[in-house]
């Protein structure tokens, strides 16, 4: 549903004029600040807008100009592209929309028809972070690994190419393509499922492959693709990493640097996460958790910097990178800025990768510091979890994830969504008992014990650091905070800064807020009634400045489920996970209706077939295969169906859903390749038992602290 205000007269552009973004236009984006031409607005990806019509003096008058219901309750993570009064963006399942930026009127819609069963292959939801627009085409990468070029005027497909090298492996794509020099660049995800990462460049005109760069070495018995892979293989020792994939996927940040004609890749975690399994002889495991610079035209290696040598915690370096010119220690430098998962904020010289700064921006316990001489972190040996479980900060969601930051070069600050979100790491039981790790081709491959995760958490609950989120103004050179806003939930949205003196941010509580960039004071706030992950953008159309944001949570936090301890104000749990595009302007007067509270009642459970041994077995299988979407202890986080609320009809066909995949067309694929009907029965009994416990609590028949969470 689109609800505009009184619609201005629109001068429709001719089809030949739509989407005509080229390299020069992006390089000179500052000359047309009303457009948002690229993923991070410019090639530098600072996500800081020079627009000032909306500013500190009048932001209190901001209101909804129009909105569009997107018809999904899955997470929305897209950064829209706005050019010449047309907005291009994506939603779940890689669907693409082109709408009028003034009214929200839909111009065209494209559905790549991703098989819904492919959702099982995605570690972290069926999300998509956006498109690239270039020379009259719109480029989108689909969840199932296709790169598709669309006519920007009509949405018709121009060409399509399969980017996946091995379709027996669980590759996915959720990231936005980047464009430069007549090429489209795209990576992929899937490290948890045992894949080998790479980035490919395609000809933007016809989709022909130009070059491909692998981020980790393959089988050393085979010829290496280039000298860098031969060099990297020497840093993997004692294991058969190529059989479990190795990881190193580039699932988010790819940045083009016109100053050096370089392409920077943000490389992900190892597969499995645990290095003692992946590379038992030690080694840095290049290029995991690294920033890699390539020649943008040829894909030739230039330099790299590894943020977390021998990654052991899922500390990706795929988080957004920004480029800037800054004075560092009295010298003008062209720098790259990144706040990856590991909790240190890196400032690198873009010419050669020299480390200039590495200051912690959140609570970090895995390392004491980064040695600026060696460039390496100083690990904390007391948190080695090879023998015993250890709480570590950050956990695998990181001190900062993919949610965008904003770089204010003039102020020397970064407006950063950060988090303290720990995990207790413990080696998988089978490896501890036998010293042998068996890859699971149909599930996650972390090397950690997830089957018993609830019991492990409860056994160590008193030692758990408190999870929380932050929005902060951070000085990357000094490591100091200018100001900090604490947010009760850790999983919040991206950030936009503007020359109007404002910082915009959406959070898990459903609040879209404008802060004073000088001191963090709240100047304006709007309740969207839906938790947010996506970054805001701002643009100008017909002389009017707008601010927009997509609503809807999910993504990598699906496994955490309902927050523990509870966060009463969590919007998508309180109301619904309503996917919307909201667009604001000064004087906007469209009103959103206040939604009803979500029905969270749990039906009575049939416990006649339930027994403790079946429940205990079911818990292990649930945590291995179901919990990553449906939530820890069967408590959904709001984006995926809450299994405690299944009705009698769904209970009747439970095994047909889980084994046969009768809901495959809805995104719930079958698991016959990894589960037996008997094991599905056990999962069913665990779900019933957990539902019954929480129902008794909700009826006041049991104190919350007495609810049984585990049967291990």
Give the predicted meaning of each segment.
Residues 3-16, 597-616, 620-624, 666-712:
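Flexible coil segments in periplasmic/lumen-exposed cytochrome c-class electron-transfer proteins
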Residues 7-64, 220-229, 376-380, 459-461, ...:
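Blade/loop signatures of beta-propeller domains
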Residues 36-40, 73-95, 120-146, 172-193, ...:
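Repeat-blade elements of multi-bladed beta-propeller folds
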Residues 68-79, 109-132, 160-176, 214-253, ...:
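Extracytoplasmic beta-rich repeat domains
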Residues 186-198, 238, 265-285, 420-464, ...:
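Short, conserved, GDST-rich strand-edge loop motifs in beta-rich repeat architectures
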Residues 537-599:
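Blade-level signature of beta-propeller repeat domains, shared across WD40, Kelch, NHL, RCC1
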Residues 592-614, 627-646:
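His/Cys-centered metal/cofactor-coordination and adjacent catalytic loops
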Residues 619, 631-664, 669-671:
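Gly/Gly-Pro-rich "capping" loops immediately C-terminal to redox-active cysteine motifs
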């Amino acid at each position: 549903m689109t609800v505009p205000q009184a619609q201005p007269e629109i001068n429709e552009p001719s089809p030949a004029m739509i989407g005509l973004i080229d390299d020069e236009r992006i390089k000179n984006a500052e000359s047309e600040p009303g457009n948002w031409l690229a993923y991070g607005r410019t090639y530098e990806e600072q996500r800081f807008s020079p627009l000032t019509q909306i500013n500190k003096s009048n932001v209190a008058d901001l209101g909804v100009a129009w909105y569009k219901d997107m018809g999904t309750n899955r997470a929305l993570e897209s950064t829209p592209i706005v050019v010449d009064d047309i907005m291009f963006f994506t939603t779940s399942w890689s669907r693409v929309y082109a709408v009028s930026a003034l009214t929200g009127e839909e111009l065209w819609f494209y559905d790549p028809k991703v098989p819904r069963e492919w959702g099982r292959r995605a570690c972290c939801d069926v999300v998509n972070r956006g498109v690239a627009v270039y020379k009259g085409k719109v480029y989108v990468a689909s969840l199932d690994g296709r790169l598709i070029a669309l006519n920007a005027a009509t949405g018709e497909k121009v060409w399509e190419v399969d980017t996946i090298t091995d379709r027996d492996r669980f590759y996915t794509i959720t990231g936005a393509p980047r464009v430069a020099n007549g090429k489209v660049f795209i990576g992929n995800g899937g490290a948890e499922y045992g894949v080998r990462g790479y980035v490919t460049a395609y000809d933007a005109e016809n989709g022909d492959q130009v070059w491909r760069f692998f981020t980790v070495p393959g089988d050393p018995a085979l010829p290496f693709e280039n000298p860098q892979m031969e060099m990297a293989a020497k840093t993997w020792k004692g294991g058969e990493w190529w059989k479990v994939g190795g990881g190193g996927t580039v699932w988010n940040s790819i940045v083009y640097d016109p100053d050096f004609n370089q392409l920077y890749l943000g490389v992900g975690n190892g597969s499995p996460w645990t290095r003692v399994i992946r590379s038992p002889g030690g080694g840095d495991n290049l290029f995991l958790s690294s920033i890699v610079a390539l020649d943008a035209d040829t894909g030739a290696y230039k330099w790299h910097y590894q943020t977390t040598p021998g990654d052991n915690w899922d500390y990706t370096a795929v988080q957004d990178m920004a480029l800037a010119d800054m004075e560092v220690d009295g010298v003008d430098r062209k720098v790259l800025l990144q706040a990856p998962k590991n909790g240190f904020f890196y400032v690198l010289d873009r010419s050669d990768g020299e480390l200039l700064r590495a200051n912690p921006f959140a609570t970090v316990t895995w390392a004491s510091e980064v040695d600026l001489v060696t460039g390496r972190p100083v690990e904390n040996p007391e948190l080695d979890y090879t023998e015993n479980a250890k709480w570590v900060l950050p956990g695998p969601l990181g001190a900062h994830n993919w949610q965008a930051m904003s770089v204010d070069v003039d102020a020397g600050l970064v407006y950063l969504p950060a988090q303290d979100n720990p995990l207790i790491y413990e080696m998988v039981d089978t490896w501890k008992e036998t010293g042998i790790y068996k890859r699971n081709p149909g599930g996650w491959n972390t090397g950690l014990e997830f089957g018993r995760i609830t019991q492990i958490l409860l056994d160590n609950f008193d030692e758990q650091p408190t999870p929380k989120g932050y929005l902060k103004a951070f000085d990357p050179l000094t490591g100091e905070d200018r100001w900090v806003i604490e947010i009760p939930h850790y999983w919040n949205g991206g950030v936009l800064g503007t020359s109007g003196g404002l910082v915009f941010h959406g959070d898990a509580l459903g609040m879209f807020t404008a802060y004073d960039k000088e001191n963090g004071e709240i100047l304006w706030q709007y309740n969207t009634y839906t938790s947010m992950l996506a970054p805001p953008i701002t643009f100008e159309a017909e002389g009017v400045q707008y601010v927009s944001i997509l609503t809807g949570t999910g993504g990598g936090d699906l496994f955490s489920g309902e927050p523990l301890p509870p966060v009463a104000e969590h919007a998508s749990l309180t109301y619904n996970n309503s996917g919307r595009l909201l667009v604001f302007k000064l004087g906007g007067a469209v009103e959103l209706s206040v939604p009803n509270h979500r029905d969270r009642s749990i039906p009575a459970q049939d416990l006649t077939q339930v027994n403790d041994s079946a429940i205990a077995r079911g818990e292990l299988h649930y945590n291995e295969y179901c919990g990553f979407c449906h939530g820890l202890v069967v408590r959904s986080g709001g984006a995926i169906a809450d299994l405690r609320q299944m009705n009698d009809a769904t209970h009747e066909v439970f095994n047909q859903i889980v084994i046969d995949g009768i809901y495959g067309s809805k995104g719930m694929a079958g698991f016959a390749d990894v589960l037996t009907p008997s094991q599905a029965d056990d999962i069913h009994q665990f779900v019933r038992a957990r539902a019954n416990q929480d129902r008794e609590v909700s009826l006041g028949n049991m104190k919350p602290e007495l609810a049984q969470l585990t049967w291990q």
